[in-house]
A protein has these predicted regions:
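Bacterial N-terminal signal peptides
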Residues: 1-7
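Phosphate-group recognition and catalysis centered on beta-loop-alpha active-site segments
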Residues: 10-284
Length: 284
């Protein structure tokens, strides 16, 4: 999912049944420090929650009330060139629509309802990218924006700038080419860049992109602590994806895996179990 952090320093602990008191902007920095706390990035804006679909503003609000302040979201483009939140090429899995996203205009898409990960229809609508940004604008939250292949980077940037949300967005990249292109377009914005191994680390160090504009995504396979320390030595935060099998494994081990990864040097957990991970890493 930046120098998102002085990573959430000194969060007050509350009973899990209560609304969590979120960290303020003043307590957040995306530059690595040994004083940082770890935090969670909700994959697809929150998944695996009964009654709350992925890439849904109401899900963001639900998780925000539980202490989640980082949301990885997917931005796609409709037939009439409008930006919406949608992971798949097709509307079918996560909404009552059946067509491909690029075959339907926004007016039609707004007639559909979102479906949760258990196949249950909700009353929630598919949000536009602008609507999602507007929700987050008044809150100490951050979006990690995963841009679908058909979407023009310039349209993404224009929407972010119109919302004045440049400081609350991290743009997700998967290749050094994408990272260079986006950095050239918006040199002041943060980028999530791939650093899964020594080769990718060296490529990024020689890319010309300042390290203070990087957050390192180290993949979904566990790296050794020495490699993560090398990233930290550049004052770059480490994001690790526990999506899929690792989240499933952790759920059977009382969250011990997350604590082990924390000791390894993981700063940001990209996860499908946002609430569980947040509670685990914030226990006394």
């Amino acid at each position: 999912m930046f120098s998102l952090l002085t990573i959430f320093s000194c969060n007050p602990k509350k009973n899990q049944s209560e609304t969590h008191q979120n960290t303020s902007f003043e307590e957040i920095s995306f530059k690595y420090s040994t004083k940082n706390k770890n935090f969670v990035s909700a994959h697809r804006g929150g998944s695996g929650i009964h009654g709350f679909p992925e890439n849904c503003v109401e899900t963001f609000e639900h998780l925000y009330q539980k202490g989640i302040q980082i949301f990885e979201i997917d931005v796609a483009e409709t037939k009439d060139n409008q930006l919406i939140l949608m992971h798949d090429n097709s509307l079918q899995r996560t909404s009552t629509g059946r067509q491909d996203v690029n075959q339907v205009d926004l007016k039609t898409i707004k007639e559909y309802f979102l479906v949760d990960d258990f196949g249950q229809q909700t009353s929630y609508k598919i949000p536009t990218f602008a609507e999602a940004l507007n929700w987050g604008k008044s809150k100490p939250i951050y979006f990690m924006v995963d841009i679908k292949k058909s979407v023009d980077y310039r349209d993404i940037v224009k929407t972010i700038e119109q919302a004045n949300m440049q400081k609350q967005v991290v743009l997700v990249t998967y290749t050094i080419g994408q990272a260079k292109k986006l950095h050239q377009l918006v040199p002041d914005m943060l980028l999530s860049v791939s650093m899964r191994n020594e080769r990718e680390f060296n490529e990024m160090m020689n890319s010309g992109i300042p390290t203070d504009k990087m957050v390192a995504f180290t993949g979904t396979r566990r790296n050794d602590k020495t490699f993560l320390n090398k990233i930290h030595d550049k004052d770059i935060l480490v994001i690790f994806g526990t999506l899929g099998n690792l989240d499933k494994s952790a759920s059977t081990r009382n969250g011990q895996l997350y604590r082990d990864l924390e000791k390894d040097g993981v700063d940001i957990f990209a996860t499908d179990r946002a609430i569980d991970v947040h509670q685990t890493i914030n226990k006394n």
